[in-house]
C-alpha cells in the first residue's frame, strides 16, 4: 500500500480520451466516495480539468486505482493503461506539487491550476474522503506553490498573446484603472483579454463586434458595453487602448479613421494592439505621431523572451518541489514509525495480559505461587523474543550483515 497518483493529461492522451475520463461537478462527490472505498485509509482526491484527470489516494494499490477508473467510466483497461502515468510515495508527492505550481501545465507556470487543485481538495473534504495524510499533503502543496510563486519569476512574464497584450498596456500606462479600452472582436482571445483587463482594475471596456448579440453575451460577464463595428468611429476617440482580434479579411481600422480620432483626442496618445492575422489595423497607422501600434509578431517576440525566462525560473521551482517532497516523506516516515512503535507496544501488552490472566487462573486454582511465577517469566520471555530471534536467524542464514547489525543495535546486544 502506498501514496499514489494516477493520471491522464494533455501530454499522454487525446482530447477524446480526456473527455471520457473527466468527472462532472455533479458526479465528483460520489466518485470520490467510491474511489476512497478502494483504499485502506479511505482517503482520495480527484482533480478533473480540461487538460487532466488525476486521482490521489493514500494506502492504495496503483493497479487497483486504474482498474477503478476504467470501471467507473466503462473504458477498456488496456487502452487506459497506455495513456496513464503512475507515481508512488515521494514521486506522487512531487508530482502534485509540480502540478499545483504550474510546472506540468500546457502553459508553463499558469496560475489557474492552483485554484483548481484547491477546489478539488475542498470537494474531497466535503465528501469526507480526506484524513491526516491527504490533509497534510495538500496543505503542504499549497504552501509549496506559494513558495514557487514568491521565490521564482515563473509567473511574472506573459506567455499568452492575450496576457502579453495587457502586459504591454501596463508598461505604457502607469495604471490601467483609469484607462478606457476598446476591444474589437468577441472571440476567445478577446474574451481572455477582457478578463486580464478586469483583473487589472479596468472599469471602462467597450466591445465592438460584427454580431452585436455575441458582443452583448460576452459583455455581461465583464460589465462592458457592446457596440457594432459600424459604431467604432463614434467610440474610438474615447479609447486610450485598442486591442483587436477578428477574422475579418480586410482591415477594420484605417489610418484616416485613427487620425481623425487622435485629432478629437487633442493628440493624447493611443495604444493599438493588433492580434489578428490578417491584420485588423492598417500598418500605416503606426506612422501617426500619437499612435503606438503593435502587431502579433511584436507580442510573439515578447512571449518567446518570457518563455525562456519562465523555463529558467522552472529550474529553480523544480529544486523547491524536490526538497519539499523529501521533507513531506520524512514527516510521513516519522508518522509510520510512531504507528510501528504503537503496534509493537500494543502487541507486547496483549501477550503480557494473556499470560498474566493464565497465571492468575492457576493461582486461583491453588497452584504453587513460585512455580506459577517462574512459568509466567519463562513464557513471557519466550513469546517476546520469538520474533526478534526469527529475524536474527534469517539474517544470519542469508549472510545479511547490514540487517544483522541493525537488529543487534536495536536489541542492545552490542552494549554487552
Swiss-Prot record:
Superkingdom to which the source organism belongs: Bacteria
UniProt keyword list: NADP, Oxidoreductase, Porphyrin biosynthesis
Binding locations of NADP(+): 185-190
GO molecular function, one term: NADP binding
Entry EC no(s): 1.2.1.70
Gene Ontology biological process terms, A to Z: protoporphyrinogen IX biosynthetic process from glutamate
Annotated catalysed reactions: (S)-4-amino-5-oxopentanoate + tRNA(Glu) + NADP(+) = L-glutamyl-tRNA(Glu) + NADPH + H(+)
Binding annotation for substrate: 49-52, 105, 110-112, 116
Residues carrying the site annotation Important for activity: 95
Oligomeric and partner information: Homodimer.
Record-stated family: Belongs to the glutamyl-tRNA reductase family.
Further comment found in the protein's record: During catalysis, the active site Cys acts as a nucleophile attacking the alpha-carbonyl group of tRNA-bound glutamate with the formation of a thioester intermediate between enzyme and glutamate, and the concomitant release of tRNA(Glu). The thioester intermediate is finally reduced by direct hydride transfer from NADPH, to form the product GSA.
Domain notes: Possesses an unusual extended V-shaped dimeric structure with each monomer consisting of three distinct domains arranged along a curved 'spinal' alpha-helix. The N-terminal catalytic domain specifically recognizes the glutamate moiety of the substrate. The second domain is the NADPH-binding domain, and the third C-terminal domain is responsible for dimerization.
General function of this protein: Catalyzes the NADPH-dependent reduction of glutamyl-tRNA(Glu) to glutamate 1-semialdehyde (GSA).
Entry protein name: Glutamyl-tRNA reductase
Organism this protein belongs to: Shewanella denitrificans (strain OS217 / ATCC BAA-1090 / DSM 15013)
The organism's taxonomic lineage, starting at the top: Bacteria, Pseudomonadati, Pseudomonadota, Gammaproteobacteria, Alteromonadales
Amino acid at each position: 500500500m502506498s501514496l499514489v497518483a494516477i493520471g491522464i493529461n494533455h501530454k499522454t492522451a487525446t482530447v477524446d480520451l480526456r473527455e471520457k475520463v473527466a468527472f462532472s461537478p455533479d458526479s465528483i462527490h460520489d466518485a470520490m466516495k467510491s474511489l476512497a472505498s478502494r483504499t485502506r485509509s479511505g482517503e482520495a482526491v480527484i482533480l478533473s480539468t480540461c487538460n487532466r484527470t488525476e486521482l490521489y489516494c493514500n494506502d492504495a494499490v496503483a493497479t487497483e486505482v486504474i482498474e477503478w477508473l476504467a470501471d467507473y467510466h466503462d473504458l477498456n483497461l488496456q487502452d487506459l493503461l497506455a495513456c496513464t502515468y503512475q507515481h508512488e510515495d515521494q514521486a506522487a508527492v512531487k508530482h502534485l506539487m509540480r502540478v499545483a505550481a504550474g510546472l506540468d501545465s500546457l502553459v508553463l507556470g499558469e496560475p489557474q491550476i492552483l485554484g483548481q487543485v484547491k477546489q478539488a481538495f475542498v470537494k474531497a473534504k466535503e465528501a469526507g474522503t480526506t484524513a491526516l495524510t491527504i490533509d497534510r499533503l495538500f496543505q503542504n502543496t499549497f504552501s509549496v506553490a506559494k513558495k514557487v510563486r514568491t521565490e521564482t519569476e515563473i509567473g511574472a512574464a506573459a506567455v499568452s498573446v492575450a496576457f502579453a497584450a495587457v502586459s504591454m498596456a501596463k508598461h505604457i500606462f502607469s495604471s490601467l484603472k483609469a484607462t478606457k479600452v476598446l476591444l474589437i472582436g468577441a472571440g476567445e482571445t478577446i474574451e481572455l483579454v477582457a478578463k486580464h483587463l478586469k483583473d487589472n482594475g479596468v472599469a471602462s471596456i467597450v466591445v465592438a463586434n460584427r454580431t452585436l448579440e455575441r458582443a452583448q453575451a460576452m459583455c455581461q460577464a465583464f460589465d462592458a458595453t457592446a457596440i457594432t463595428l459600424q459604431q467604432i468611429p463614434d467610440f474610438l476617440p474615447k479609447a486610450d487602448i485598442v486591442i483587436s482580434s477578428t477574422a475579418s479579411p480586410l482591415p477594420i481600422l484605417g489610418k484616416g479613421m485613427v487620425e481623425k480620432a487622435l485629432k478629437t483626442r487633442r493628440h493624447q496618445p493611443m495604444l493599438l494592439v493588433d492580434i489578428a492575422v490578417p491584420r485588423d489595423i492598417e500598418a500605416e497607422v503606426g506612422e501617426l505621431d500619437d499612435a503606438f501600434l503593435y502587431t502579433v509578431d511584436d507580442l510573439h517576440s515578447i512571449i518567446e523572451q518570457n518563455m525562456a525566462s519562465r523555463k529558467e525560473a522552472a529550474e529553480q521551482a523544480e529544486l523547491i518541489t524536490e526538497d519539499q517532497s523529501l521533507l513531506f516523506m520524512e514527516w510521513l516516515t516519522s508518522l509510520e514509525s510512531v504507528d510501528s512503535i504503537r503496534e509493537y507496544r500494543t502487541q507486547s501488552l496483549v501477550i503480557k495480559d494473556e499470560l498474566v490472566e493464565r497465571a492468575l487462573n492457576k493461582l486461583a486454582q491453588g497452584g504453587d505461587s513460585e512455580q506459577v511465577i517462574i512459568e509466567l517469566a519463562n513464557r513471557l520471555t519466550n513469546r517476546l523474543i520469538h520474533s526478534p530471534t526469527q529475524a536474527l536467524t534469517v539474517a544470519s542464514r542469508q549472510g545479511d550483515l547490514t540487517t544483522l547489525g541493525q537488529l543487534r543495535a536495536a536489541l542492545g546486544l552490542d552494549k554487552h
